Regions:
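Short catalytic helix/loop segments, enriched in acidic residues and glycine
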Residues: 23-39
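Conserved catalytic core of nucleotide-sugar-dependent glycosyltransferases
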Residues: 168-182
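Catalytic-core segments of class I nucleotidyltransferases/pyrophosphorylases
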Residues: 133-140, 144, 148, 179-277
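Short, conserved catalytic or adaptor-binding loops enriched in Gly and charged residues
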Residues: 81-92, 150, 175, 231-233
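A structural signal for short hydrophobic beta-strand segments in well-ordered beta-sheet cores
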Residues: 29, 173-175, 240
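Conserved N-terminal catalytic core of the sugar/cofactor nucleotidyltransferase
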Residues: 2-9, 17, 35-122, 128-129
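Conserved donor-nucleotide/metal-binding helix-loop-beta segment in metal-dependent transferases, i.e.
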Residues: 130-167
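Short N-terminal binding/cap micro-motifs at the start of the first secondary-structure element
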Residues: 15-20, 168
């Protein structure tokens, strides 16, 4: 069985819900307090075993600074861990441009000519954290590692799942044991098969490229990736990995991102005291 050594960071969307901010800075570069969102994803991928990271971007986005060597900044802030200043420092980086926004499946197609074997996928505006360390003693998320470990046991494609209170806003799954039996896109709440939803983490198998050709964008549109996952469900199987114990932060819209900032700051040991004191004072006014 081939090792999972490639990770695809999907960061091509225009971020319309985050305009006007996303007109000048990619939503994937927005900081969760002081650490860019994409830095969390890069370190998570490395923690899971990635040796090559493929960034799917659009023509108007530039990730060259974050993907480069920022060790020069250590002279200014020696307290910041090297892997946070230069989060891609220990992997090979490939940038692939999706010239026309045609959905998740088409975005993956932009990178697959450079990938042999299974690969991780991380959606660029979704951060999943199970530790809340600061910039001095940063500890990467284990979310993708959990999926890779499941793939290594089964050789089957895997999707990360999170329990939510508003499943009508997501792709919701019906499960049979650890197997995904159905994915329902944004169902009415009363029709949702569960409260488990896709949360932007995947391990896909090496047949993905052929399946994206079989279930083409021209026929399936932006549901192309769902058609591929349905193929796996109906054949050898698609594993659902519940990522309990993780906080899910979303940089794709203002209110969720603001809530993310506050929640994350309240969980960080180096910030929680001062931010809690300020919040308590502010809420009393």
């Amino acid at each position: 069985m081939a090792a999972v050594e490639d990770a695809v960071l999907v960061a091509g969307g225009i971020g319309s819900r985050m305009l006007p901010a996303s007109a000048v800075i990619a939503k994937e570069l927005l900081p969760l307090v002081d650490i860019p969102a994409i830095s969390h994803l890069a370190r998570e991928a490395v923690e899971a075993g990635a040796k090559r990271i493929h960034i799917i971007t659009s023509p108007n986005k530039d990730f060259s600074n974050i993907a480069g060597d920022n060790s020069w900044a250590s002279g200014k802030r020696a307290d910041i861990a090297k892997e946070i200043l230069s989060p891609f420092c220990d992997v090979d980086v490939f940038v692939h441009v999706q010239h026309v926004a045609r959905g998740f499946g088409d975005a993956l197609s932009c990178a697959l000519h450079s990938i042999d074997g299974p690969f991780m996928v991380l959606l660029g505006d979704n951060i999943l954290l199970d530790t809340f360390s600061g910039t001095r003693n940063y500890v990467a998320s284990n979310a993708s590692k959990r999926l890779v470990e499941e793939y290594e046991k089964t050789s089957l494609p895997c999707v990360g799942l999170s329990a939510v209170e508003d499943p009508e806003n997501y792709g919701v799954v019906a499960m049979n044991g650890n197997l995904v039996k159905e994915i329902v896109e944004k169902p009415n709440r009363e029709l949702a098969p569960s409260n488990l939803v896709l949360c932007g983490r995947y391990v896909f198998t090496e047949d993905t490229k052929d399946l994206l050709s079989k279930y083409s964008f021209e026929e399936y549109g932006e549901l192309q990736s769902i058609a591929v996952q349905k193929h796996w469900m109906e054949n050898n199987g698609l594993i659902g990995v519940e990522l309990d114990g993780f906080q899910w932060y979303d940089s794709g819209a203002p209110i969720p991102w603001l809530k993310s900032q506050i929640d994350y700051a309240l969980r960080r040991e180096d910030l929680q005291g001062s931010i809690r004191e300020w919040l308590e004072d502010r809420l009393q006014r």
